[in-house]
């Protein structure tokens, strides 16, 4: 199960290793369609930790990283942003993104 990340634990969650964060909202259709893609990705790729931030419940991380459209996926490496994609993506695209930074 993909972990839900709060504003309070966001910085510690992204601090170490490769971490993919999905910025989403409950009312966002493409965000809902992305959830099973992320769950499948998590089951297949052990080199990345995956988390989700609900921008309505925890807006601070989204504001900090300038997220203006959802879903936005930001890839962090040891706490620093290394890449981002906006919109619904398939699993193969996300695997390529992760492999570029592994």
From Swiss-Prot:
GO-annotated biological processes: cell redox homeostasis
Residue intervals of the Thioredoxin domain: 1-102
Gene3D superfamilies: Glutaredoxin
GO cellular component terms, A-Z: cytosol
Listed InterPro entries: Thioredoxin, Thioredoxin-like_sf, Thioredoxin_CS, Thioredoxin_domain
UniProt KW keywords: Disulfide bond, Electron transport, Redox-active center, Transport
Domain of life: Bacteria
Pfam family, one: Thioredoxin
GO MF terms held by the record: protein-disulfide reductase activity
Disulfide bonds: 28-31
Function field: Participates in various redox reactions through the reversible oxidation of its active center dithiol to a disulfide and catalyzes dithiol-disulfide exchange reactions.
Homology family: Belongs to the thioredoxin family.
Cross-referenced NCBIfam families: thioredoxin
Name recorded for this polypeptide: Thioredoxin
Organism: Chlamydia caviae (strain ATCC VR-813 / DSM 19441 / 03DC25 / GPIC)
Gene behind the chain: trxA
């Amino acid at each position: 199960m993909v972990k839900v990340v709060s504003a309070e634990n966001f910085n510690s969650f992204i601090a170490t290793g490769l971490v993919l964060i999905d910025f989403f909202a409950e009312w966002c259709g493409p965000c809902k369609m992305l959830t099973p893609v992320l769950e499948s990705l998590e089951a297949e790729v052990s080199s990345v930790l995956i988390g989700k931030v609900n921008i309505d419940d925890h807006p601070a991380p989204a504001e900090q990283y300038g997220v203006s459209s959802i879903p936005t996926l930001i890839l962090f490496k040891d706490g620093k942003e290394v890449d981002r994609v906006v919109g619904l993506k398939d699993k193969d695209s996300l695997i390529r993104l992760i492999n570029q930074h592994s």
